[in-house]
């Protein structure tokens, strides 16, 4: 393979970003970590975001965990997605933290979820636990925007979930709500509480929530673009 190097500054165009991402396809995480001079953990138990951080480094990302997209100047969000040997997602995909208060007047068009999913660079990475972390390979990237049908599905779920939040029913929401988008606790520990609206309109303390794309949504998306068998 030709010698490659991390981008020293944020990419200037979507084409440059995609070209760099394509260069990473086929490399293992261990090879990319060594070339970038960063240590690789034994596993992801305590370093869950490590794969994303490594690829952000290679692609010149700028946003970190801020509300804007990873490549804010390009309007592109980076999402690494662990896949099995058949190219299917192994887990749900975090989109953004859900606002539990101050939601009067918020619409789908102005929502963080829509903003984050307007343009996404998906990078599949081997994720099966039988493969050592350093040996897991990076797959071919996909630069994606939701089509009309996908946007409709996302909007319907978002509106249903936000209605429940505004009506003070956040604690009734389960991961089963929503066809393609779900809401579930985001905190690493149960002591990190945040304010929300209770059933009688009072302020309550609850776990922070995050929006996640369900596996059926990302599986269909990958299958369609990479011509995989989707069942």
UniProtKB/Swiss-Prot annotation:
GO molecular function: DNA binding; endonuclease activity
Top-level lineage group: Bacteria
Cross-referenced InterPro entries: DNA_mismatch_repair_MutH, DNA_rep_MutH/RE_typeII_Sau3AI, DNA_rep_MutH/T2_RE_sf, Restrct_endonuc-II-like
Gene Ontology CC: cytoplasm
Keyword presence, Glycoprotein: no
Annotated compartments: Cytoplasm
Sorted UniProt keywords: Cytoplasm, DNA damage, DNA repair, Endonuclease, Hydrolase, Nuclease
One BP annotation, GO: DNA modification
Entry-linked CDD domains: MutH-like
Function, as annotated: Sequence-specific endonuclease that cleaves unmethylated GATC sequences. It is involved in DNA mismatch repair.
Similarity field: Belongs to the MutH family.
Protein name per Swiss-Prot or TrEMBL: DNA mismatch repair protein MutH
Organism: Klebsiella pneumoniae subsp. pneumoniae (strain ATCC 700721 / MGH 78578)
Lineage: Bacteria, Pseudomonadati, Pseudomonadota, Gammaproteobacteria, Enterobacterales
